[in-house]
Amino acid sequence: MDTCISGISHSGRPRESMLAQEAFGMSELIIGTECGGSDPTSGLASNVLIGEISDRMAEIGGTSILSETTEFIGAEHILAKRGKDERVSQRIYQIVHDYENAIRLVGHDVREGNPSPGNMEGGLTTLEEKSLGCIHKGGHAPVNEVYDYAKQVDKNMGLVIMDTPGNDPSSVAGM
């Protein structure tokens, strides 16, 4: 019995206390952003706040990842204008175009079912409204790079985009 109690006591300790802690500067931090349920308040409040955090990360030399390529459809031109150069701008257009084509190839149109019934119940009326809310998570900083899905993101990049699906678990797994 004493062995069981000792084992329970040992396993009950937080794992964090067993790991070596190491200080690091905020510029070393990489954050990933993700949408929750979209409604009109997303683009007015929560995503705007995330965008302010994203801008702050860029200012201090950190990295913020804007994800969910399918959520850019209808607002990609706004992101492309923020590309640091023509290559990045064209890459933004390309990843959105590729998603739209992939969806068409299987006989669907991304605009069908978007916004979703839940989005519409929340007050969104168009895919573009949903996308405008999504891109607020990227704040106002220039887009410095576009990464393929699940590629390692460099530190000290400011705002970057990762080409991920709109499905939350898949998007988060890629980041």
PLM region descriptions:
Residues S9-R13:
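A short helix-breaking turn/cap at a secondary-structure junction
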Residues A20-I30:
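Glycine-rich phosphate/diphosphate-binding loops that line cofactor/substrate pockets in enzymes
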Residues E28, T33, D39-M175:
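Anaerobic metallocofactor- and corrinoid-dependent redox/one-carbon enzyme cores
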Residues D2-G7:
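Glycine-rich phosphate-binding loops that contact phosphosugars or nucleotide phosphates
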Residues P14-A20:
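Short, charged beta->alpha transition segments
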